[in-house]
Each structure stands twice: as structure tokens, then as C-alpha cells.
Design a protein with these regions (language model features):
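Bacterial N-terminal signal peptides that target proteins for export
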Residues: 1-9
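Hydrophobic helical h-region of N-terminal Sec-dependent signal peptides
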Residues: 10-14
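C-terminal motif of bacterial Sec signal peptides marking the signal peptidase cleavage site
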Residues: 16-20
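A residue-level marker of the well-folded mature domains of exported/periplasmic proteins
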Residues: 22-347
């Protein structure tokens, strides 16, 4: 189990409560009942149906409802000041597990841990550092740099112009930094002369950086107009906008977090692959551990990452290109290759 530092930051994200309670006619479940297993989720920036990060994590919670019989609810935060209040809403109601989605909720999650020692907290994308762990808080983290590296290698090998791009949310969020810089490193690893244009949406607040599809689209189109022929969109709805810009202009796109061939069908014609974090199984696995009494004692749980299938563009990917991507992926698994990307943007 790898352990890292939890960087903390305040950020804007959610407050609409939607509940999936007991079956119709039985009334709302009592989560204080020891025989009822309840899981609550507090989202990061964006909505629960963002076709990306929040949605994929929620699907892991829903899997626990289906397979484990858990009672599940979520809260969409609308103001960063409400992080603690939203977490407390679930904890005070007797929820067994609380999933907080995104780097920005890390500080509030760590603060809630000691206040509610009987609750198991899963902090998605919230890295925990040695010496700063809380026993009932586990960070679900992923090797985004490796996934981004694979995406960059593929993009560089597929590019005819020798120019590739990436449209990202803010690089102040370490996983976004690792995706973007991993993409750059992977491209240069397989094609040192490739031109890589990465734009981070650092010019707005955290309430906007991941929820700005228009900016994402116009930024991608601007790149394309300058010769970029593969674009990696990494930043929630902002990144989704970049995918749509690629579809409009007829150039290849790479999605993020989930297999966006399914979550952004409007961009299917352009989607080469997606740099995935397997959020759904990672979330479900930790919930199941909590239910079975095998929840980790603080620290981090490292989920899997990799590329999605090529889907409609599979015929365009030469066998030698796919072989090189697979070779790199295997080298990561064997531990014989490192990305060289720092865990977070250097100060």
C-alpha cells in the first residue's frame, strides 16, 4: 500500500440531496440501526451526472446498493463552506461509510474522521501522507501519471502533424497535474520531437475550472486550428467540451477518468481512447471491505488505471502502435519504467 501526502485546498462543490432509500412503502431507512448499512457520497465540483469523476464514483456506490444491499444517498455541494456540514449530515444520521469525491474535500474529510470514529471515510483522489493519517480515513488514489503517459504515447504515435494538445482543469489539483504532465512525458518518450501544447484552466476559480465546457471546446478548437491533431481532455465538463470540439473539427480526442465513449456519446466519432481511473471498482471494493470488517487502517488504497478500448477508431491504430503502448503498460506493471512526473506541481 503506497502512502502519500494529502495536499489540502479549499474548493467549491455541492448541495442537492437525492436519496435512494428503502423500498417503496417501507419508509426511509434508519441508518442508525446496526442492521442497516448506509453509504453516503458528497460530490466534488460539478453534478453527480457529470459523465466523468462524480458519476463514476457514484456508480461504485450504486453497485454496493445492488450487490451488498446498502442504503445509498448523495449530496451535491453548492458552496465549499458546506463541505463539513454535508459530511456531518450523513455522519449524524448514522451512516456507516461516507465517500467524499475529489481532492478539494480532503481537508474536511480528515477533520471529520476523528469527530466520527465509527464512520469509515473514503476520500477519492485524497492522498494521505505518513504521519498525517487518520485511522478511519482512506485515500482512494490512482497512478494518473501512468495513465496520462500511455495516452501521450498513443497520441504522439498517432499524430500526423507532430503536434498534440491537452485541455485540462487547474494544475493546482495534483491528479490533474499528473494526467497532464504524464501525457507530456509519454509523448516525448516515444517521439522526442513531438510538439505538446498543454493548457491548464488556471485563470478561473475552483468553482469554474472543471465546469466550463465552452472554454474547453474553444481552447481545443484553437489548438486544432494551429495544427494539433490529437487532443486530451482532462477536467470534468471542461475536458468534455474539448472532446466535443474535436468531434466538430474531425480530429482525434482522448477522454479521461472513465471510458468516455459511453459517457460522452456525442464525441464517439472522435474518441481514440480514454485515460481511465477505475473509480467504480475502487469505490465498491473499499465499501465492501468496510462492510466485511476489512477496511484499511488509514493510508491509501491504490486503484487501477489504464487506457480504454479504441472502439470505433480501432482500425486506424496500426498494430505496431498498439504494441508499443502495450509494451509501456507492461513496463509500468513490471516496475521497470517510471514516468518521472512529480506527484504535484512544484512550488
Amino acid at each position: 500500500m503506497r502512502k502519500y501526502l494529502l495536499a489540502s485546498i479549499s474548493l467549491l462543490t455541492v448541495v442537492t440531496l437525492l436519496a435512494a432509500c428503502a423500498p417503496a412503502g417501507e419508509g426511509e431507512a434508519d441508518c442508525s440501526d446496526p442492521d442497516v448499512f448506509c453509504v453516503g457520497l458528497v460530490t466534488d465540483v460539478g453534478k453527480i451526472d457529470d459523465k466523468s469523476f462524480n458519476q463514476s464514483t457514484w456508480e461504485g456506490v450504486k453497485q454496493a446498493e445492488k450487490e451488498l444491499g446498502a442504503v445509498v444517498q448523495y449530496i451535491e455541494t453548492t458552496d465549499s463552506k458546506d463541505y463539513g456540514k454535508n459530511i456531518a449530515q450523513f455522519a449524524d444520521a448514522g451512516f456507516d461509510v461516507i465517500v467524499t469525491v475529489g481532492f478539494a474535500l480532503g481537508e474536511a474529510t480528515l477533520e471529520a474522521g476523528p469527530q466520527y470514529p465509527d464512520v469509515k471515510f473514503i476520500g477519492v483522489d485524497q492522498e494521505q501522507y505518513p504521519g498525517a493519517e487518520v485511522e478511519n480515513v482512506v485515500g482512494l488514489i490512482f497512478p494518473e501519471d501512468q495513465s496520462g503517459f500511455l495516452a501521450g504515447a498513443l497520441a504522439a504515435l498517432m499524430s500526423e502533424s507532430g503536434k498534440i494538445g491537452s485541455v485540462c482543469g487547474t494544475d493546482a489539483v495534483p491528479p490533474v497535474w499528473r494526467f497532464g504532465e504524464g501525457y507530456r512525458a509519454g509523448a516525448q518518450y516515444v517521439r522526442p520531437d513531438v510538439e505538446v501544447n498543454i493548457v491548464y484552466h488556471n485563470d478561473v476559480g475552483f468553482d469554474k475550472t472543471f465546469t466550463d465546457p465552452e472554454w474547453g471546446k474553444t481552447t481545443a478548437i484553437s489548438m486544432i486550428d494551429k495544427g494539433v491533431d490529437v487532443v486530451f481532455g482532462a477536467g470534468g465538463k471542461t475536458g468534455n467540451g474539448a472532446l466535443l470540439g474535436c468531434a466538430e473539427k474531425g480530429v482525434m480526442a482522448i477522454g479521461v477518468d472513465t471510458d468516455q465513449y459511453y459517457t460522452v456519446p456525442e464525441a464517439q466519432s472522435a474518441l481514440l481512447t480514454s485515460a481511465m481511473k477505475l473509480l467504480t471498482p475502487g469505490t465498491f471494493d473499499l465499501i465492501k471491505m468496510a462492510m466485511e470488517g476489512n477496511f484499511p487502517q488509514g493510508g491509501n488504497y491504490v486503484g487501477a488505471a489504464g487506457l480504454a478500448p479504441y472502439h470505433d477508431l480501432a482500425d486506424r491504430v496500426p498494430a505496431e502502435v498498439d504494441a508499443k503502448v502495450q509494451e509501456i503498460d507492461q513496463a509500468f506493471k513490471d516496475g521497470t519504467l517510471q514516468t518521472g512526473v512529480s506527484p504535484a506541481k512544484p512550488e
